[in-house]
Amino acid sequence: MSKYFLDTNILIYAYSNSEPLKADKANALIFEGDAIISLQVINEFTNVCLKKLKLNATDVSTAILEISRAIEVIGFSLKTQLHALQLSQNHSFSFYDALIISTALENNCPILYSEDLQHNQQIDHRLFIVNPFVYG
Protein backbone atom coordinates (compact mmCIF):
# COMPACT_ATOMS: atom_id res chain seq x y z
CA MET A 1 0.00 0.00 0.00
CA SER A 2 1.21 3.53 -0.79
CA LYS A 3 1.98 6.05 1.88
CA TYR A 4 -0.96 8.21 2.89
CA PHE A 5 -1.29 11.48 4.78
CA LEU A 6 -3.37 11.96 7.94
CA ASP A 7 -5.16 15.15 8.90
CA THR A 8 -5.13 16.24 12.54
CA ASN A 9 -8.69 15.07 13.21
CA ILE A 10 -7.64 11.44 12.67
CA LEU A 11 -5.10 11.71 15.49
CA ILE A 12 -7.64 13.46 17.72
CA TYR A 13 -10.13 10.60 17.38
CA ALA A 14 -7.42 8.11 18.27
CA TYR A 15 -6.72 9.87 21.56
CA SER A 16 -10.18 11.00 22.61
CA ASN A 17 -12.77 8.74 24.17
CA SER A 18 -15.76 10.37 22.53
CA GLU A 19 -16.40 7.98 19.62
CA PRO A 20 -15.04 4.43 19.95
CA LEU A 21 -15.75 3.35 16.35
CA LYS A 22 -13.89 6.35 14.98
CA ALA A 23 -11.08 5.76 17.48
CA ASP A 24 -10.68 2.18 16.23
CA LYS A 25 -10.46 3.31 12.61
CA ALA A 26 -8.09 6.16 13.49
CA ASN A 27 -5.81 3.82 15.43
CA ALA A 28 -5.72 1.41 12.49
CA LEU A 29 -4.67 4.23 10.15
CA ILE A 30 -1.98 5.38 12.58
CA PHE A 31 -0.55 2.09 13.77
CA GLU A 32 -1.26 -0.44 11.01
CA GLY A 33 -0.47 1.42 7.80
CA ASP A 34 2.16 3.56 6.14
CA ALA A 35 1.08 7.02 7.24
CA ILE A 36 2.78 10.40 7.03
CA ILE A 37 2.00 13.52 9.06
CA SER A 38 3.63 16.92 9.23
CA LEU A 39 4.89 18.93 12.16
CA GLN A 40 1.85 21.14 11.53
CA VAL A 41 -0.38 18.15 12.35
CA ILE A 42 1.62 17.51 15.54
CA ASN A 43 1.23 21.18 16.53
CA GLU A 44 -2.52 21.19 15.88
CA PHE A 45 -2.88 17.86 17.73
CA THR A 46 -0.99 19.27 20.71
CA ASN A 47 -3.18 22.36 20.84
CA VAL A 48 -6.45 20.38 20.70
CA CYS A 49 -5.25 17.88 23.30
CA LEU A 50 -4.28 20.60 25.74
CA LYS A 51 -7.20 22.98 25.21
CA LYS A 52 -10.21 20.88 24.19
CA LEU A 53 -9.42 17.41 25.52
CA LYS A 54 -7.84 18.91 28.68
CA LEU A 55 -4.95 16.44 28.67
CA ASN A 56 -1.86 17.34 30.66
CA ALA A 57 1.49 18.04 29.00
CA THR A 58 2.96 14.70 30.09
CA ASP A 59 0.12 12.73 28.48
CA VAL A 60 0.37 14.81 25.30
CA SER A 61 4.14 14.26 25.17
CA THR A 62 3.61 10.53 25.56
CA ALA A 63 1.05 10.53 22.75
CA ILE A 64 3.36 12.51 20.45
CA LEU A 65 6.22 10.08 21.06
CA GLU A 66 3.91 7.11 20.46
CA ILE A 67 2.65 8.63 17.21
CA SER A 68 6.15 9.55 16.03
CA ARG A 69 7.30 5.95 16.48
CA ALA A 70 4.46 4.72 14.26
CA ILE A 71 4.29 7.48 11.63
CA GLU A 72 6.81 9.38 9.56
CA VAL A 73 6.74 13.02 10.73
CA ILE A 74 7.93 15.53 8.14
CA GLY A 75 8.45 19.26 7.88
CA PHE A 76 7.61 21.44 4.92
CA SER A 77 9.42 23.94 2.75
CA LEU A 78 8.80 27.51 1.70
CA LYS A 79 7.77 26.09 -1.69
CA THR A 80 5.12 24.02 0.10
CA GLN A 81 3.83 27.09 1.91
CA LEU A 82 3.62 29.10 -1.32
CA HIS A 83 1.79 26.24 -3.04
CA ALA A 84 -0.62 26.19 -0.08
CA LEU A 85 -1.43 29.84 -0.71
CA GLN A 86 -2.31 28.99 -4.32
CA LEU A 87 -4.43 26.02 -3.25
CA SER A 88 -6.21 28.17 -0.69
CA GLN A 89 -7.07 30.75 -3.31
CA ASN A 90 -7.97 28.30 -6.10
CA HIS A 91 -10.06 25.88 -4.02
CA SER A 92 -11.33 28.09 -1.17
CA PHE A 93 -9.57 26.00 1.47
CA SER A 94 -8.51 27.56 4.73
CA PHE A 95 -4.79 28.24 4.64
CA TYR A 96 -3.99 25.54 7.20
CA ASP A 97 -6.04 22.92 5.34
CA ALA A 98 -4.26 23.97 2.14
CA LEU A 99 -0.90 23.58 3.88
CA ILE A 100 -1.75 19.99 4.84
CA ILE A 101 -2.89 19.30 1.27
CA SER A 102 0.24 20.90 -0.17
CA THR A 103 2.47 18.86 2.14
CA ALA A 104 0.68 15.65 1.14
CA LEU A 105 1.14 16.52 -2.54
CA GLU A 106 4.82 17.38 -2.06
CA ASN A 107 5.36 13.96 -0.49
CA ASN A 108 3.53 12.11 -3.29
CA CYS A 109 0.75 10.78 -1.08
CA PRO A 110 -2.19 9.63 -3.22
CA ILE A 111 -4.64 9.82 -0.28
CA LEU A 112 -5.27 12.36 2.46
CA TYR A 113 -7.51 10.97 5.20
CA SER A 114 -9.61 13.73 6.73
CA GLU A 115 -13.05 14.10 8.22
CA ASP A 116 -13.09 17.86 7.71
CA LEU A 117 -12.58 18.11 3.95
CA GLN A 118 -14.83 17.07 1.07
CA HIS A 119 -14.93 13.28 0.73
CA ASN A 120 -13.66 11.99 -2.65
CA GLN A 121 -12.42 15.40 -3.78
CA GLN A 122 -9.40 15.18 -6.07
CA ILE A 123 -6.65 17.81 -5.91
CA ASP A 124 -4.21 18.45 -8.77
CA HIS A 125 -5.14 15.10 -10.35
CA ARG A 126 -2.87 13.41 -7.78
CA LEU A 127 -4.45 13.50 -4.34
CA PHE A 128 -7.81 12.12 -3.20
CA ILE A 129 -9.37 13.30 0.03
CA VAL A 130 -11.01 10.38 1.81
CA ASN A 131 -13.19 10.50 4.91
CA PRO A 132 -12.31 7.21 6.64
CA PHE A 133 -15.46 7.41 8.74
CA VAL A 134 -17.87 7.22 5.79
CA TYR A 135 -19.42 3.78 6.01
CA GLY A 136 -21.44 1.98 3.39
Residue ranges and their predicted role:
Residues 44-72:
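Active-site-proximal, substrate-binding regions of enzyme catalytic domains
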